[in-house]
Amino acid sequence: MEVTAEDLGKRSFCEAVMRARLPKAVFKELKKTIDYGAPLDAAIADSVAIAMREWAKELGATHYTHWFHPLTNLTAEKHDSFMDPVGDGTFITEFTGKELIKAEPDGSSFPSGGIRETCAARGYTVWDCTSPAFVKEIPDGCKVLCIPTIFISYTGESLDHKTPLLRSMDAVNKQALRILKLFGKTPAKVTASVGPEQEYFLIDKDKFNQRLDLKLTGRTLFGAPAPKGQELDDQYFGVIKDKVSHFMRELNKDLWEYGIPAKTQHNEVAPSQHEIAPIYGTTNVATDQNQLLMETLKKVAERNGFACLLHEKPFAGVNGSGKHNNWSITTDDGINLLEPGKTPHENVQFLLVLTCILKAVAVSYTHLTLPTT
């Protein structure tokens, strides 16, 4: 299974693809929206939708979906075909800017945190143009153009995890720009970035199928300790078994095709535990990619005779699976605000930014930072 240069990012409607397929004026206006939140004209949206549809069709896509993150901690999608009836018994393929920007899925069966009744069905998905669309292939099924979106109620309340994330990124941007003005600096934007490491367990499928608790809950609920655990620290960074290495190779190929910058892979501390880590990216994009990564982990594991466990503590007595987040904030002209420099104790800008973050954590998580009696 060879990975060629043409495979890298081929299923992602990334900036390079947009630049190549969109008229220059359209690409320029879309970039203003992506980078600085400028309003998106309907004509621009129509042009983007046409280019996105043609690109997806070339990859074999027959359907599209507004892909979002409801409060289930999973992703959600409803597939609509590109086919529209003309009226004389024939069909045309169509995908408009209106369909790209907004859809109205039934929100009554999604959790809402108690903010509305079940009969309040209407929900809206709205395109997050800052996160690249991608084409997902369903084994033995259709190929689907997935458009990252937010999910809100008719009255504007957030019904997903992504809307608060985007709002928090906007708040960080505004306050960071305010602080930087005190130092005489005037960048146009400050962006939060994150590189989430993903730990997971691979269990042989025949062993997995013998455990009803693993099948139903993704973790063991009872059982004896393993004959050999992690006492010798010989699993961590150890030689990767051939079967696992084959799985990782197939996983990387799929991730690279999606444009996910998977970089590092290794054995973790516990037996049968492993890790994959991508290069950091803009926070909402990295979050979308992590959801897609977890879905891909499970699918590739299935194809290779494994079950992939993503539960944070699937086995007692050995390490659980964390998701370390390498987080930072950076200006649009390339300055990392959490870079301490050679003399951090004299770097007033770094100290102020760090103090603001510590203060925010202290205020938000008082129960974790203050002693209890």
Question: What does each model-found stretch correspond to?
Answer:
Residues 7-122:
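Active-site core of metal-dependent hydrolases
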Residues 123-252:
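ATP/Mg2+-dependent ligation/transfer catalytic cores
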Residues 149, 232-235, 273-283, 327:
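Short, hydrophobic beta-strand segments
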Residues 198, 268-276, 321-323:
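Short, conserved phosphate-binding/catalytic loop or strand-edge motifs used
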Residues 213-223, 285-304, 329-361:
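Helical (often loop-to-helix) elements that flank the catalytic cores of nucleotide-handling enzymes
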Residues 228-258, 289-308:
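Substrate-binding cleft of carbohydrate-active enzyme catalytic domains
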Residues 317, 321-335:
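Flexible glycine/proline-rich, aromatic-decorated loop/lid segments
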Residues 366-372:
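Conserved small/polar residues in nucleotide/adenosyl-binding loops
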